[in-house]
Design a protein with these regions (language model features):
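Extracytoplasmic ligand-binding site segments that recognize negatively charged/polar headgroups
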Residues: 76, 116-120, 134-148, 182-206, ...
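Bacterial Sec-exported substrate-binding components of ABC uptake systems
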Residues: 10-54, 157-187
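Alpha-helical, coiled-coil/dimerization segments enriched in small aliphatic residues
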Residues: 198-224
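Structured C-terminal subdomain patch of bacterial secreted/periplasmic proteins
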Residues: 13, 146-153, 160, 164, ...
Length: 285
């Protein structure tokens, strides 16, 4: 449904006067109103998660990424697998180590509201410019985030083009769904992240925009709250969304899915007979 998701927020760039170096510098206001000075148009950019890498590659060439996450190279989890196939070093699932940071010495770090505060403080204390985005947990927030990122990397016009294309695709999807006039269905996300998927998540916004009822919301559970087995049974969805098979199951998503579907209580539900596999990138990326 909407591959265009992650990207933009209102920020301003102010040219700084002075010597040659300062003439290249500019100030960006990030999602949390931090005024961040960027010494020059960055060439070695480090994102702190796969979603940020995806947004970055909407506005810069792959050569400007200083590193990428291992998950970026998995086509089942990432939209940018082909673009980052030659990028090194690769950041493991457990995050950015000091060794990697020192090795690549980025001239810009783009972090999110999910980044731990102690890491943000450390990076700033070492002199790295850190620009933060918020979430994103909604389409509107994604558009704001991409505008922040685009300004931070010195590509404001590219950011506006990405947002315009997102809006075009969303309108096209809305028009197609409206013409089909399908009866409402209720879907339940089967996920290891047992607190993910309710109202307040990107998944919920996209699902409901597609005209599908979210079973998590139907039983009163919000994003960040636990969905118990009792509530799963109570939700009585029309179908389950599950993780599709991948070549490797390093995250354990396939094992979790199989265990879930082997539960007798789940097998007695009508949704057990309508299991829809989705690549993880359509759920989490």
């Amino acid at each position: 449904l909407c591959i265009a998701l992650f990207l933009l927020s209102g920020c301003e760039m102010k040219k700084m006067g002075g010597d040659a170096a300062s003439k290249e510098s500019y100030v960006v206001t990030d999602a949390f109103d931090n005024q961040v000075t960027i010494p020059h148009k960055p060439k070695k950019i480090l994102g702190t998660d796969s979603a940020i890498d995806t947004m970055l590659l909407g506005v810069v060439e792959p050569s400007r990424l200083a590193a990428c996450f291992i998950a970026d190279k998995d086509p089942g989890m990432s939209y940018i697998a082909d673009e980052v196939k030659d990028i090194k070093p690769e950041i493991p699932l457990n995050g950015i180590s000091m060794e990697i940071l020192t090795k690549i010495s980025p001239d810009l770090i783009v972090a999110s509201s999910y980044t731990r505060q102690k890491e943000l403080d450390m990076w700033r204390s070492l002199g790295y410019p850190v620009v933060m985005i918020d979430g994103p947990t909604s389409i509107a927030q994604a558009e704001k985030d991409i505008r922040i990122i685009a300004a931070a990397v010195g590509e404001t016009e590219r950011g506006e083009k990405v947002v315009a294309e997102m809006e075009r695709q969303l309108k096209e999807v809305d028009s197609t769904l409206s013409a089909r006039n399908l009866p409402p269905q209720t879907g339940l996300l089967v996920s290891q992240m047992s607190r993910y998927g309710g109202p307040g998540s990107m998944y919920h916004e996209l699902l409901t925009r597609a005209g599908i009822k979210n079973a998590i919301a139907e039983v009163g559970v919000a994003n960040g709250q636990l969905l118990s087995q009792e509530l799963i049974v109570k939700s009585d969805p029309d179908f389950f969304f599950v993780s599709a098979d991948r070549e490797s199951d390093e995250t354990g998503a396939g094992k979790f899915r199989d265990s879930f579907l082997a539960n007798p209580a789940i097998q007695n539900m009508r949704a057990y007979h309508r299991v829809i596999p989705l690549e993880d990138r359509y759920i989490y990326a």
